[in-house]
C-alpha cells in the first residue's frame, strides 16, 4: 500500500481537485490518504471528510504535520503531497515497482499556469533537481517507510524541511527522479509577484545554507 500524507491549512479551494481523482485507488486498497490539518479556519476538514481515510488535527508546521501523518501510516511507501499539487493515479501506481530499487525520490513538475515564464521556471527547477539530486515538496517526495523511520522522519524545521530531508536521504542512496510531471500551483508567484517570489526564495536558500535559524526564515517566508 502507498500512504499519501497531505499537510494542510486552509486549503478548501484546492482539496477536491487534488484528491477526487484518487478515490478509485482508495477503493482498490492501493492507497490510503491521511490529511493532517494545522488549524484550518475554513471548510478544509468538511470538504476532506469524504475524500480521505484519516483526518488528524495538530499544530501548524509542515515538517511536524507530515511526521504526525507518517506515524499512523500503514503503507510501505510514504508519499507527501501538497494540497495545491496534482498527481495522477498512474504516477502513484508506478511507485510500487520502483520503490524496491530506490528508497526515495520525487517527480518533475510543471505549473498550472502555462505562461512561458512558468515553463522556464519549471525547466530550471527540474534541471536543478537533476544536477543536485534533491527535490522540493511541490515535486511530491516519496520515501520507503523503513528508511523514513530509520532517519526519524522530517527534521523539526519551520521551513526547508524538504531540502534537509533530501540531503539526509542522499547519504543513503541517490533519488529516483520520475520522468513524469506532477502539476503544481503557481498561486504564490501570482499572488506576490513572479520575480519578487523567485528573489525571496533565493534569499531564503542563501540564509538557510548559512545556518540561519528556521524560525527566522519562516517569518520571512510568510
Label every model-predicted segment.
Residues 6, 30-39, 56:
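Short beta-strand/loop segment that forms part of the nucleotide-sugar
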Residues 10-25:
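Short, well-formed alpha-helical segments that are part of the catalytic scaffolds
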Residues 13-17, 42-50, 90:
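Acidic helix N-cap motif at the loop->helix transition within catalytic regions
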Residues 31, 45-72:
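Conserved donor nucleotide-binding strand/loop of the catalytic core
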Residues 37-45, 85:
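A conserved acidic beta->alpha catalytic loop
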Residues 90-117:
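Conserved donor NDP-sugar-binding/catalytic core segment of glycosyltransferases
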Residues 167-222:
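Hydrophobic helical membrane-anchoring modules
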